[in-house]
A protein has these predicted regions:
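Generic detector of well-ordered alpha-helical segments enriched in charged/polar residues
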Residues: 5-8, 48-58, 66-70, 145, ...
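Non-catalytic architectural context of zinc metalloproteases
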Residues: 1-52, 85, 156-168, 172, ...
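Auxiliary, metal-adjacent structural segments of Zn-dependent hydrolase domains
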Residues: 31-99
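Active-site-flanking segments in enzyme catalytic domains
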Residues: 73-215
Length: 215
């Protein structure tokens, strides 16, 4: 808890641990399992690892950026929930959802990979939510879709998600690079979040996106 308190004070966010997450977790559209269901040692190690990743990730943002999610009265803002599991069809290890005053970000403490990337990915979702809450026209669909391959449809619109489809991604040696990976083709929001995730923590790979004639 002390490690979380330091991050709260330093970055102007709220961090909930274990059973503290119960009320906020119930607001998510995904079923969330709290970390107090885990073995005590595994919970402690997982929470410590994610808090360390959060510290490294938060340091990448301009000073005061994360605190700007608070409202004009200085209330609400970014609230992180460190949990045991997020139940979804896509195997997500983080999810973001909002209320009038809070942007909630749940992070799976059992996921031992891409921790910093996941934090930055979810912070972008919260950022996009915040932007749209202030100006719902901020992202022009036609302008964005014009950057995609001709005739492309995101999978959440077609209902046909294939996690192994590497076409137009950085992992395909064929056509131009339009997307980071197959998950970026799930939804426009995931596309943007994947790009921001790679710009923040995967500098070398992000260079491939920047250099691509397609993008």
């Amino acid at each position: 808890r002390q490690q979380a308190d330091v991050l709260e004070q330093r970055y102007g966010v709220r961090i909930l641990l274990s059973s503290q997450c119960r009320e906020a977790a119930a607001l998510s559209s995904y079923p969330i399992t709290l970390s107090d269901t885990m073995d005590a040692e595994a919970e402690l190690n997982g929470v410590r690892a994610v808090l360390t990743a959060m510290d490294r990730s938060f340091a990448l943002y301009p000073e005061g950026f994360l605190a700007q999610f608070r409202n004009r009265a200085g209330e609400g803002g970014l609230c992180f929930l460190l949990v045991a599991h997020i139940d979804s069809d896509y195997g997500v290890v983080g999810c973001t959802y909002d209320t009038a005053d809070w942007q909630y970000i749940a992070l799976d403490v059992q996921a031992d990979y891409m921790r910093e990337g996941t934090v930055c990915h979810e912070i972008w979702h919260a950022t996009e939510n915040e932007i749209l809450s202030r100006d719902y026209t901020a992202f022009n669909w036609d302008d964005w879709n014009a950057l995609n391959p001709a005739g492309f449809t995101y999978w959440n619109d077609s209902g046909d998600y294939d996690r192994y489809d590497a076409r137009w991604t950085m992992f395909d040696n064929g056509e131009g690079v339009y997307f980071v990976d197959s998950y970026a083709k799930l939804a426009v929001q995931e596309d943007r979040a994947r790009i921001m995730e790679y710009f923040m923590v995967h500098e070398d790979e992000a260079g491939l996106l920047i250099q691509s004639d397609a993008r």
